[in-house]
A protein has these predicted regions:
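Short loop/turn segments that connect beta-strands within beta-propeller blades
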Residues: 31-35, 99-103, 143-147, 207-211, ...
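A structural motif specific to WD40 beta-propellers
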Residues: 38-41, 105-106, 149-150, 213-214, ...
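Mature N-terminal segment immediately following signal peptide/propeptide cleavage
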Residues: 1-9
Length: 264
């Protein structure tokens, strides 16, 4: 779930059968809604699968990724491949702008491959997203209208879940970067099948144009969902690096120089 810029609403995805959906769709709520006697308002098309919604600064529109242009039906969501936990990377995902009534007002991507995981700069002028348009899962930026697309990460592996710093000058993201010949072969083999294995990810930080890229964590296991603290001086993230069997995940805070790791 993500806050609106005025902190009054939340937008999130759900496949709650009690709300009449079986495939992830986007819903909006006031921050204090409880849904004891009601259900949240669906603001996506109700077709295909959706992911990664984020409010625009006007609080009247949002972006999200959806597969509905390719197929109204819900695409398969495999959880394991040869015993390994995997995420599907649907090449039918594109990024759209919608109003709060669920009306799509613009399509921002139309390239072959996966386009998703989009978030917006605090200034409301730039979008960062993950795409496979070059054959790998890299980060790109574009203007709020979909123009001026630029690739900003280039190393082999999965770069995703990027967020801007409060001043818009930096990005924090999760990355799974294979290094050995075996890891590279497995990574490419999974991606050829539209899959990625998210069990070994570290956090990386860079300028918003991709410069000054550096690895922030080296903890092992899955370190993900990083966001900047409002001060811009720390990163809050989720990790299972202390877990013996993959669970539980806990929240941690770390300085931008990788020091002072603290479990929250």
């Amino acid at each position: 779930a993500y806050w609106s810029f005025d902190d009054k609403k939340l937008i999130f995805q759900s496949n709650n059968n009690n709300w009449g959906v079986e495939c992830d769709q986007m819903f909006i709520m006031d921050f204090d809604d409880t849904f004891d006697k009601s259900q949240p308002k669906m603001v996506s098309t109700g077709n295909g699968r959706t992911t990664c919604s984020y409010f625009l600064p006007d609080n009247e529109h949002f972006i999200y990724a959806s597969t509905h242009l390719k197929d109204d039906n819900c695409p398969e969501a495999p959880l394991r491949k040869e015993g390994k936990y995997v995420w599907p990377i649907y090449d039918s995902f594109d990024i759209f702008i919608s109003d709060l009534e669920g009306n799509i007002t613009g399509q921002l991507t139309n390239e072959k491959g996966y386009d998703a995981e989009a978030t917006i700069s605090p200034h409301g002028d730039k979008i960062v997203f993950t795409s496979t348009r070059n054959g790998d899962l890299d980060l790109y930026t574009m203007n709020i209208d979909g123009s001026n697309v630029k690739q900003i990460t280039f190393d082999l592996g999965y770069d995703g879940g990027a967020f801007f710093s409060p001043d818009g000058s930096k990005l924090i993201f999760r990355s799974s970067r294979p290094k050995t010949e075996k890891e590279i072969k497995e990574n490419k083999g999974l991606l050829d099948q539209g899959l990625v294995q998210p069990t070994n990810m570290e956090l990386y930080i860079c300028d918003s144009d991709g410069k000054n890229l550096r690895q922030l964590t080296d903890l092992g296991n899955a370190n993900w969902s990083p966001v900047f603290h409002p001060s811009g001086k720390k990163i809050l993230f989720s990790s299972n690096f202390e877990a013996e069997r993959g669970f539980p995940f806990n929240l941690y805070m770390i300085d931008l120089d990788g020091k002072n790791l603290t479990r929250v």
